[in-house]
Regions:
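Asp-based, Mg2+/Mn2+-dependent phosphohydrolase catalytic module
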Residues: 1-9, 103-106, 119-120, 124-224
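Conserved catalytic-core motifs of eukaryotic protein kinase domains, centered on the activation segment
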Residues: 22, 116, 125
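Conserved SAM-binding loop
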Residues: 17, 46, 112-115, 147, ...
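A generic structural signal for short
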Residues: 17, 89-90, 111-112, 143, ...
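Hydrophobic, well-structured mid-protein blocks that either form specific transmembrane helices
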Residues: 93-98, 111-116, 132
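N-terminal helical cap/lid subdomain that shapes the substrate entry/recognition surface
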Residues: 2-100, 106-108, 121
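Residue-level detector of anion-binding/catalytic polar loops
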Residues: 38, 111, 188
Length: 224
């Protein structure tokens, strides 16, 4: 990867920085129980790991052949987020090497930010619990600008707050929603292949595929 001209690195959160799969499945199961349904079976795999909370839960209901509650999809997402907020911090660990690599990037003078479909308050809580919130200048949640990825708006919103143009940034993510967001925003995309994404990501342009931050070359850029 040639880091020339890169002034900012923006990261998706779930499946890119934090392995939140266990916490997400647990919160989804608790939401089903709240609705009067059976909990999810052990080792359940979420049918959707890249949308908003409401999207995730709607797809769980569909996969389990359960009806949408009368309160609607938006309320369903809020119930999920309530249960997710109760999960213990250790339920969403950092991927190996994340903190050291982020710190190295900061030491090179790069601006760092997070752009996630998680609610902003939950994103702040998760990053703080993981001990990396202090490394980011901007954290954008799905409620920060009124629209979620794969729309380009959240990423452009993030870069606007960093005062960095799209051509001078790289977006790190794990799903095709991240890749589509980057493409629409005119931002280079780096794919974390060990996250929650599928081969759908291969349909989008990428400057880097990597599975481990510990093997990722450290940025050594000279900023103009």
């Amino acid at each position: 990867m040639d880091w020339t001209g890169v002034r900012a690195m923006v990261f998706d959160m779930d499946g890119t920085l934090l392995n939140t799969e266990h916490a997400i499945v647990t919160a989804a199961s608790q939401t089903l129980v709240q609705l009067g349904h059976a909990p999810l079976p052990a080792a359940y795999r979420m049918p959707n790991m890249f949308g908003t909370a409401a999207d995730l839960m709607a797809d769980v209901l569909k996969e389990r052949q359960l009806p949408m509650p009368q309160a609607g999809k938006a309320q369903l997402g809020q119930w999920f987020e309530h249960h997710y907020a109760q999960q213990p911090p250790h339920g969403a660990p950092l991927y190996a090497g994340v903190r050291a690599w982020l710190q190295a990037a900061r030491d090179q003078g790069l601006a760092l930010a997070v752009c996630t479909n998680k609610q902003h308050a939950l994103a702040l809580k998760g990053l703080e619990a993981a001990g990396i919130l202090d490394l980011f200048q901007v954290v954008t949640g799905r409620d920060s600008c009124g629209v979620a990825k794969p729309a380009p708006d959240p990423l452009l919103f993030t870069l606007g707050h960093l005062h960095v143009p799209p051509h001078a940034a790289v977006f790190f993510g794990d799903t095709h929603a991240d890749a589509a967001c980057a493409q629409a925003a005119g931002v280079r995309f780096a794919w974390f292949t060990a996250g929650f994404g599928t081969d759908l990501v291969r349909q989008y342009p990428r400057v880097l595929d990597f599975a481990d931050y510990r093997g990722l070359p450290l940025p050594t850029v000279a900023l103009a």
